């Protein structure tokens, strides 16, 4: 089994465990889109307590990748909602799941064809 398949299966299990309403297809495509960062321990997760990282998510992912045309408050609210959905005490907020939830929140799942 390839490392990518192992990551996808792990993220699917975590998604199920956390009760996230994400399809296997969306998780798979979000994970594939994040190679090679999913193999780097620090880059694999999102820290909801790091405002600089959340600003990067907002600018690079929401605005640039997804093309979200919303004010900062709306994007901040969506990011906070995802942080809470993944569990505030959860130290393993995997970037693939985080991005998939944000894409779903803004109705932009089609970014992952």
Protein language model features and the residues they cover:
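Core of compact, soluble alpha-helical bundle domains
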Residues: 2-60, 110
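Short amphipathic alpha-helical segments and their helix-coil junctions
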Residues: 9-16, 71-89
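Short acidic, glycine/proline-enriched loop segments that cap or flank alpha-helices
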Residues: 22, 45-49, 66-71, 85-94
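Amphipathic alpha-helical interaction segments
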Residues: 25, 29, 33, 77, ...
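Short, residue-level hotspots on alpha-helical faces of the histone-fold
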Residues: 33, 60, 64, 100-104
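Strongly charged, low-complexity linkers/loops
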Residues: 50-58, 66-82
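Amphipathic alpha-helical binding modules
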Residues: 81-113
């Amino acid at each position: 089994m390839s490392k990518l398949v192992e990551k996808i299966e792990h993220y699917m299990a975590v998604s199920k465990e956390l009760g996230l309403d994400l399809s296997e297809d969306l998780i798979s495509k979000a994970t594939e889109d994040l190679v090679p960062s999913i193999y780097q321990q620090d880059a694999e997760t999102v820290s909801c307590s790091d405002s600089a990282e959340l600003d990067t998510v907002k600018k690079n992912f929401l605005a640039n990748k997804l093309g979200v045309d919303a004010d900062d408050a709306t994007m901040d609210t969506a990011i906070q909602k995802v942080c809470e959905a993944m569990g505030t005490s959860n130290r393993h907020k995997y970037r693939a799941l985080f991005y998939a939830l944000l894409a779903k929140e803004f109705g932009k799942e089609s970014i992952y064809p």
